[in-house]
């Protein structure tokens, strides 16, 4: 939604039901892409290349990840899924050798701008094949609460299964809920990293992908051919196609962009240029249990990327670009009658919560009460739902 109207009522982040991307182009119509290299001054990666196409990170093995702006939820109660309000711009750290801090260059990866206390979610629309994706927040697993690891685990599970998992809005809190990702500066102790580990060293977001083994991938392709054959016969009989494991579910539309106001930082204390993720309100979203045996996945990651979260002033200083406008007013969004969403997969099992993540407190305990107006959406507003490669992104030492 770019003009305040819902295009088809079944899109959350620009991926429409017909498979066409409504908002997949960069703001100027050009695809900004690039390879990420392995450390400062390193050589380009080949098989392990993470690439940027538009604002989408494409990891080896088929995972696609976009960072989506959204409405911040109140820290009390459990809410429907908030909408997408457009993508965060993503840039390679290696493209700014003269302005990016040495610490960023050493870690490699990409950067994106966030306001203090801004909410985000991760979209996996466009993920091409089954992939186990690890998501870290300050090198703490957002699924298990365990320290970052280069190996997959199922006790507890420390990864998401794509494309079955269509998106991730926050850390796993079990019982069909997650707690929203909210940006905070390092140094307060408010990040998930600070609360779980007792220190704030890394910040940012970490992504790591594991493809299926060759044998499991061959079996997956065989099952997909059988599934497509069944769907084709169903369509010929006029029946409705089922969701299935092999394709991501339909997403929701981007909400109206915030007005083009001056890109001033959000109210509150001036944040550090280094940002991490804390948690905000709770929402109805499941983190799905993997129904494959662990042996189906590769033992080593195919690729990884460090995502630096930076303040708007630091973004402007490093890139020379204006950051996106301040986030849209959430009460005004709801008053306008625009949609919120519910998503439930009856064929999947939700992961149980972990002690480490259950103990994480909301950022309001550090930043103060959330005074932004809130208006509960009406039941009618809650909608139930069921490219060529670019240059590689540089990896580094983290």
Briefly describe each language-model feature range.
Residues 1-40:
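Long, intrinsically disordered low-complexity tandem-repeat segments
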Residues 44-398:
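Intrinsically disordered, low-complexity segments enriched in small/polar residues
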